[in-house]
């Protein structure tokens, strides 16, 4: 797989879980003999939702909720076949979204 690069994007609502997952991916791939760049923290996406507290009137009384999406980027430069195989068999939490591009 000479000259290739694998790019992994991780997304999660919990920053501790995403950091643990990124650390696990980096350890697994480096033990398999590939070079890793990252994890690079990307900007956190913050969505704010404004909801009226009362179902009927009192429109001035509102409540704000926010949802933060944390993102990390990991690049694997010149991956070995063993590194790709170990990457496919790694076990990560369900609340971490993983996008892998070759």
UniProtKB/Swiss-Prot annotation:
GO CC field: ribonucleoprotein complex; ribosome
Superkingdom of the source species: Bacteria
Gene Ontology biological-process entries: translation
Gene3D superfamilies in UniProt: Ribosomal protein S10 domain
Protein's UniProt keywords contain Ribosomal protein: yes
MF term (GO), any: tRNA binding
Keywords: Ribonucleoprotein, Ribosomal protein
Main function: Involved in the binding of tRNA to the ribosomes.
HAMAP family: Ribosomal_uS10
Similarity annotation: Belongs to the universal ribosomal protein uS10 family.
Subunit structure: Part of the 30S ribosomal subunit.
Protein name according to UniProt: Small ribosomal subunit protein uS10
Originating organism: Bifidobacterium animalis subsp. lactis (strain AD011)
Record lineage: Bacteria, Bacillati, Actinomycetota, Actinomycetes, Bifidobacteriales
Protein's gene: rpsJ
């Amino acid at each position: 797989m000479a000259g290739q690069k694998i790019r992994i994007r991780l997304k999660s609502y919990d920053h501790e879980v995403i950091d643990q997952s990124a650390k696990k991916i980096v350890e697994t791939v480096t033990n398999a003999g590939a070079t890793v760049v990252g994890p690079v923290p990307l900007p956190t996406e913050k969505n704010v939702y404004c909801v009226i507290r009362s179902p009927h009137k009192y429109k001035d009384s509102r409540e704000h909720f926010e949802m933060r999406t944390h993102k990390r980027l990991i690049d694997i430069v010149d991956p070995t076949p063993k590194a790709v195989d170990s990457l496919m068999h790694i076990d990560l939490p369900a609340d971490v979204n993983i996008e892998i591009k070759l």
